[in-house]
Amino acid sequence: MPLDRGGPTMARLKLATYNVNGIKSRLDKLLEWLGRESPDIVCLQELKAEDTGFPRKALRDAGYGAVFVGQKSWNGVAILAKDADPIEVRRGLPGDDKDTQGRYIEAAVDGLLVACLYLPNGNPQPGPKFDYKLAWFERLIRHAATLQKSGHAVVLAGDYNVIPTDLDIYNTRSWLKDALLQPASRECYRRLLAQGWTDSIRALHPDERIYTFWDYFRQHWEHNSGLRIDHLLLNETLAPRLVSAGVDTWVRGRPGASDHAPTWIVLDDAPRKAVRKRAPARKVAKRAPARRAKA
């Protein structure tokens, strides 16, 4: 049963993370989603565009300011804010001055410190790509410990490229050799949570199979053969404000869509005492049958 927060209705903030898988080629899908769902803050991954190719004007026309780190053909992350300009705090994950990949950015938005990340995939493993993934994860763990103790309300949002538990995958059999499912990857995620970070989806939907990614191959979307690899982690200062969480799966059903769907949370503007309450159906994101989603 989902958790909701009691008390009077207050101003709320909707924050989402979305691996857009090419911002130029899928700009129309992004703008459609922004117009329909109207999130206040958005973390984007896999822009696959240099800074000069970032669609700043189109997003500004849609009502969103942005900070971003681009990279030609690969990676790239951005933070969007509705009717505001995010204030960039950090560009790049600390710990390796030689790492120039566009995978991490931090910004101050609406009283929050928002960190947007695109963790390395790590395939094939074993090998140098998997070694880089684990080294990057270690750097994230060290930096996250600093953020946890900063006193600020912090969210670590993005594509983590890790499947935390077997509940987060349709079937482990086909993924046993994949970097996303390796014990070392899962252990890094567990260590991150052990610092006191709250996995938003699991905090509110502890027993439900919720996916954020469906591979393009073998009709994974049509068969709902998904993974949950896009996560929004809240530090101890911010977690008490969590109200609801879900996935906008309708976006994945659009022709030519990214293989990810936007994952979102709603925050109160002040902490609320948690009470158990049956949530309205709209608060639990369910994937519509593929034949309807593609209509």
Regions found by a protein language model. Give the residues of each.
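Internal catalytic-core helix/loop-beta-alpha segment
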Residues: 134-146
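Active-site-proximal beta-strand elements of phosphoester/diester hydrolases
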Residues: 12-21, 111-126, 157
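Active-site beta-strand/loop signature of hydrolases that rely on acidic residues for catalysis
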Residues: 15-19, 34-52, 114, 143-166, ...
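N-terminal, active-site-proximal structural segment of metallo-dependent hydrolase catalytic domains
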Residues: 2-61, 74-77, 272-295
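Surface-exposed cleft-lining segments at the edges of enzyme active sites
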Residues: 94-95, 120-137, 173-178
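Catalytic metal-binding/acid-base residues of hydrolase active sites
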Residues: 21, 48, 94, 120, ...
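Structured beta-strand-rich core segments of catalytic domains in phosphoester-bond hydrolases
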Residues: 47-50, 54-124
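Metal-dependent phosphoester-hydrolase catalytic domains
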Residues: 36, 51-53, 85, 89-96, ...
